Amino acid sequence: MKLKHGQNSQDEIKLIWLIVGQLATWIGASFIWPLTSVYLNKELHISLSIIGVVLFCNCVGTILGSILAGHYYDRHNPYPLILWGVGLDALVLFLMAAFHGWPEYWIWLTITGFLGGWNGTLINSLATSLKRYPGRYVFNVLYFSQNLGVVTGTLIVGYLYDYSVTLLFVIAALLFVIAFVNAVFNYRPIIKFHQERVENKQSGNNQKIIPMPKRNFIMNMAFFTTLAVTWLMYMNWESNLSVYMVSLGIPFHMYSLLWTLNASIIVIMQGILARFPRMFKTLFHQIIFGIFMFAISFITLVFAKDFTHFALSMIILTLGEATAFPAIPAFVNDLSPSTSKGKYQGATMVASGIGRAFGPLFGGLVIDKAGYIPFFWVASILIALMIVVMIPLYLKLHQKLTLYK
């Protein structure tokens, strides 16, 4: 008897190999983004305003990569798509190692942004094909792996940067080579998954793309809006907050320490969530808890004047990040028909990318006009507003939602 994809453990990608790919690519990526502003400003003498444009282009590239990857995943064999994405990323990083002047660095960073969105969406989409584990567990583990990569990368980059920026780019490229080799040998089962999709269409089982029910679509739009708004505010931790802390007399290396704290807590939290997947009654409860923590974290910033209080704010923020961010793509997966899972995983990346692209600009405008304290209140209120919208919406729709496990 012919078994469907996932019924035989040999014809499904093993979760461990998705973890390896996630780790390698995120360690490599974490060699690049922390040093970009410092390298461009201190080494290449690029103004902060131009650096803002460079980072914006990187985020726009990520958005475009996410959209295209989600579109092609649902329509084509994902195996060559992921190979091309990871392989080209390795090539671009080798080119960055050889040519990292101006404006070449800008070009390479924009391309890596596109490929980062492409690869991230494909990894999440590949995860939706796994049937041996609950979606919540898979996305928690992948988010854990992502942040373990960030912890490792950001810890190493500070030491290697003082030694050689070229070496950093070479090591990042080699990590993507590892991810490429891993994909070549271990992602082949996705070919069978794609073949079954094609056979289903040819046999008439799924001749047409399954439309997403209207209620599911509305709920997903609420999640995407929440992601965009949350990232819009969160990105100010990566940009404007460093200036604020330094203005209060807190050394820059203490600000950097907050990100090590952030990633470490995420790793611990994801380990706990993986060990106790039913800690929250439903994915929606997990999302609401996380978004609530985000709102509270910005309120605590109103009163933060020393490192201890900033660390407390970061801990609260990280509890929100560790719970909400992996739960949203998992819930979106449950709400998405099998013929459009890639599309909607791409949409989660796009929503995040929009928030990341415009966050520093939005925060800078509010801070320039009103100051930091009013911005913290604005951020908290807007994030809390997402909860006010989502809870009654979910209560109205949840019994009528169609779930696609």
Where are the model-predicted features located?
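Symmetry-related core transmembrane helices of the 12-TM Major Facilitator Superfamily/SLC fold
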Residues: 168-185, 376-392
